[in-house]
């Protein structure tokens, strides 16, 4: 009996030793394999998954990238699945001006009062700010052509007053003059005195290159910081004559830069038969597309009132943001519509351009 018990014990020890040797060999064999030949580890159950090879099961397609917060910086290098086109899914910001029947801002509306649609499809509002505190980048563009020059002194005075009134420490403004050419008289600055001096130095010129001014002004704003509001305030007679760019180039530049355009049309001739109304209509179309406003002062003294209204509107805007559908063709326009409860008047940009991801 004793001998029999000893043999069983010995057998158990030999079995354990054999299992140990087999496990060691398997481990060595796995470590000697190249990475692509090893079996994957079990998939993690955490919510913050990544698209690394070790977390993707064999014979399965990798998960679709989610780039709402732009986390995947290498998404440009990933091939697009056949038949699909990825576009930017960065947050779409929409500035909204809400006005009552007397064109006065309507403040303090809750998020529940707003609905936003892209291509007719309702979107979830991810960002909502009442009276947004986003700093301003403003391109103040003044027509220096001879056709508008009899009003230039009033324009300069009103613009100088506006600069002193609108600028806060975190805001920046640049002064441009345009005739047949476009000149930046002062770079983006918060220095009120320097900017006012630049306005007073605007020279006489000939020709009116409105489209060129919009292209260059939008480009200058687009190169600024992303988290700032971009505004063009253009004072002109509306008589487009000498631009190298055309209407669509100007419109596309303003939309791509997410520029808010306010147009002040100083009409030297009141009768439509003596004016370039085609230029006025083109400016009005671009202004409406960006969500801005157009003004037709009857007298030079009205300029102060208009500048005050623009200032008040900029300080009472709502900011809405949503994440769009990431699928679709690139470099195309997508429509935006904002609805507000009650009978308020609403202005906002009507479209944006998709970009490659």
Predicted features, each with a name:
Residues 5, 21-25:
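Extracytoplasmic/periplasmic terminal helices and flexible tails
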